Every structure is written in structure tokens, then in C-alpha cells.
UniProtKB/Swiss-Prot annotation:
It comes from Streptococcus pneumoniae serotype 2 (strain D39 / NCTC 7466). SUPFAM superfamilies: Ribokinase-like (SSF53613). This is Hydroxyethylthiazole kinase 2. Its cofactor is Mg(2+). Pfam families: HK.
Amino acid sequence: MQEFTNPFPIGSSSLIHCITNEISCEMLANGILALGCKPVMADDSREVLDFTKQSQALFINLGHLSAEKEKAIRMAASYANQSSLPMVVDAVGVTTSSIRKSLVKDLLDYRPTVLKGNMSEIRSLVGLKHHGVGVDASAKDQETEDLLQVLKDWCQTYPGMSFLVTGPKDLVVSKNQVAVLGNGCTELDWITGTGDLVGALTAVFLSQGKTGFEASCLAVSYLNIAAEKIVVQGMGLEEFRYQVLNQLSLLRRDENWLDTIKGEVYE
């Protein structure tokens, strides 16, 4: 797509601080490395600021939340806000957990660069009817017309923030732009952590100076296109997971990968 410029090669090996869950931690670390940056995962409040202060972007994922992790998240988010450090917040599980939803709403005061979630999570967060269960989106929540209008209103309240909403059609909404993106494959739903990985990749592109809107579009498209390149091979679950990470490191060598992004950007 002509709207975006190729972020590769990565200009510097940025440090990406991920406060995330134990299930997808290894996948995120390898995905960040595959793009040419360096990951660190520190969620102990005694040291969290030491790592956040050295980082070029912060990714906060609410999976496996605990009181200690919440303390670390609040400390890191506060520092990111004070120092203008790019920050991605992934609203995992807010459809089910009132604690997580309350935390995300508090984190809005720290002005994250990108707020990410699946269709059900974002609908829940902005007060729309939803059918999400656990941390998964519901097929009943894929209507976008009412969601887009509410997100546009929210972007007026939080003008520096972009929304990244994952689903069969991925949505990226900022104050002045909307993208509806169509890459991807259902096989990505077979393995845990791919949604978390999108958030981490968004942080990578933010560390390279991309806006929240650009970084979100690039991240979700990059992972989806990488997956599209291998799905035709008809492989098993673990092999598919392995090859997704493999393609993340290979796709950046393709100078024309942006041409395979499917979707539209509206002003």
C-alpha cells in the first residue's frame, strides 16, 4: 500500500520492554528478535523502571495479571507517559475481568500510543454490547459500523492514541485516519500468543519512529502476510507455529512486502 513506507532495515537494535504473560513470552521475544530488535521482559516492581528507562518502546499485556504485575505496569506506564516513551497496551480479558477493565481505563490517563484488543475486548471497553468469553472474541461481535463511530469519538478525547482492533477484518483508528485491513488466515487462531505478538511488533515499529497508526497497520499486516506465505503448505500445528516465526525473519528481506497488504485507508 502506498500509504506506508517500508520500516526495514531496522535502523537500530531498539530495546523493547514487554510486561506480558508467561504463555506467550517466548514467542514475543523471538518475534522481536526476528525483526532486528532486542526484547526484555521484566515485571517485578523492584526492577521494572530500570529496564523501562533503557527501552525505546513499552508493551503492556494484561494476560496473567497479578497484584504485583499490576504495580509494575502502573509504574512503567507512568514513566512512559512522563518521558514520552511509545507505549502499547493490550486489553486482554477485559470482557471477563472487571479488574482488568478498570486497570485499562486507568492506563488511559498515561496516554498510551496504541490501545489494542480483539473485537469483543474493545467493544466491552468502550461500552458496546459484546459476547466475548474469557480472552477470546465472539463471532457475534464482528459488526464494525457502530464500533467505528464510538472509536472516532474516543480518539477525540485521546487525540494522540490509536486503536488496533483485531478480527477477520483488522481495524486501526486514529483521530484522523481509519484503516480496514484484510490479510491473514484462520490458522493463526490455532496457536496461542499470535494476538500478543501483534502488540509486540507494534512496539517494534513505534521504536523506529512510526506513528501509532502506522505502527499498528504495519504490525498486524506483517504478521498476517508472514502467515499467508506458509498456510498453503498444509502443515501441523507445531510446524505452523515454527514457520510463522521463521517467516517473520524472512519477510523483511522482501522489499515489496508492502504491496501485498490488503485493505483501505480512509481520512
